[in-house]
Amino acid sequence: MKTIFRIAQTELRLFFYSPIAWLILIIFAFQAGMAFCDTFSYQLQNKALGRGQIPFQTVILLLGDSGSFFKVLNNLYLYIPLLTMALMSREYSSGSIKLLYSSPVTNFQIIGGKFLAMMLYGGLMLVILLLQVVFAFIFVKNLDIPLILSGLLGIYLVLCAYSAIGLFMSTLTSYQIVVAVGTLVILTCLNFVGGLWQDIPVVQEITWWLSLSGRAKTFTAGLICSEDVVYFGVVIGLFLTLSVLKLQSTKQHYSWWWRWARYGGMVCIALGIGYLTSKPMFMCYYDTTETEHNTITREGQRVMNLIDDQLTITMYVNLLDKSAPAGMPENQMSNLRELKPFLRFKPDTRLKYVYFYDSTDHSRFRGATASLPLREQMLKICDDEDLDPEFFLSPEEIHRQIDLTSEGNRMIYLLERANGRKSFLRFYDGMDIRPRETEITVALKRLVTDASRIVFLTGHGERSLYWNDKGGLYSLIQRNGR
């Protein structure tokens, strides 16, 4: 450990001997300060104009979409590659790497020392953000400190992940510009990989987990999830290990297939860990917000605890339904995200998808196309969207499984307990078609409680009891029983 600390100390000195480290700190402080001052001045203007005090000042000033932490987080990728591009490239170009190889220092110590230097530099960047926290603590009543600490943890983990990626890229070449560009390319790939191969089972879960996009926003929202912590740990560990392997292959001669086998093996191990830890049964959560904003309501928790047997949630997707694109395989992980707050309290819940085509009162087609036979409509959509027709059950096949005619054969969730109790959870018309916490809780509650007797008053302008539009909110029964 002493050797690692010495290397880190030397690396920090080299950082601050050049103007880049100082310049980055100054620009970072200026950017973070301007973001904070803009939001703070807007709140002062509201107060001066008599608009009253807006609640949730912790989120508005620091962690919300207009907060300084959020804006800083979106720009971190601009700073870290400028620092990491010289970590190992400088050793290659100056020839000092030969001195390191001939000295009694291991490859792990070299990589560990340089990464520790980046961790310490990242700590200096957090100190700048802590100054804003101190200022907010003075002027904001009841500041949510645990929420802020969660946000700072997320930012720091992103800094460390970017540093590990940049360090690995710097071991590949002596050209610093190539390292910086390569780091940006890797970061871009990690941000967009979550949208790749989402129509392939298992692979969709791996690429979704591998995506870096939005990881830190979970922390800034105040929710610390073991999946996200493990993700950053695996990414950091993977790229540091790849860096050590690269130095070993430089010192010792290995055949090309053995080098690639070692790299591939480490990547497979990392993906395997990620796949396992992304399963709900292996997840742990800690909601740091004072109001438990990231946790379902107490009533929702009570309902989930009452379901003491196997719960199965099946999504029935009618290809001819307007809402069908939201239920296609490429959107399965997005749908899982909506259910995740409930799966937190019952991680053994089974999720299933059934795809079919049938007549519906919510059809994609209008005019002459809508009069075509159902199979021809299905084939037309499959041809337009490059889908396999054999993937969808025919009307006769789906009718043998379930009768959805009472729901207009629309896309719908079926919630089913092992004791046989069932409940439908609908999708709706409009911009936001997915059911939210209130609607999900109501559907789950029907699995654990008997139907109540409801009396309606009519004849005084009330909404109609008999309106039967499943996707609308025009009738009172649809509004309260979504």
Name every feature range the model reports, one short phrase each:
Residues P19-L44, K71-I80, V185-C189:
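Hydrophobic alpha-helical transmembrane segments of multi-pass membrane transport/permease proteins
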